[in-house]
């Protein structure tokens, strides 16, 4: 999992990327390409 300050640029890298909020953190998850998983931090 990548940890980035800004997720906006990562969101457009793959069409299956989804932005989700869990426990006060912002994540990008991708069911088809797991390598695009990221967390804002």
UniProtKB/Swiss-Prot annotation:
Keywords of this entry: Ribonucleoprotein, Ribosomal protein
One record GO biological process: translation
Single GO MF descriptor: structural constituent of ribosome
Annotated Gene Ontology cellular component terms: ribonucleoprotein complex; ribosome
SUPFAM superfamilies according to UniProt: Ribosomal protein L36 (SSF57840)
InterPro entries according to UniProt: Ribosomal_bL36, Ribosomal_bL36_sp, Ribosomal_L36_bact
Pfam families referenced in this protein's UniProt entry, alphabetically: Ribosomal_L36
Record family assignment: Belongs to the bacterial ribosomal protein bL36 family.
Protein name: Large ribosomal subunit protein bL36
Gene responsible for this protein: rpmJ
């Amino acid at each position: 999992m990548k940890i980035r300050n800004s997720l906006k640029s990562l969101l457009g890298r793959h069409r299956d990327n989804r932005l989700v909020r869990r426990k006060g953190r912002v994540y990008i998850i991708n069911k088809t390409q797991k390598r695009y998983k990221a967390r804002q931090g």
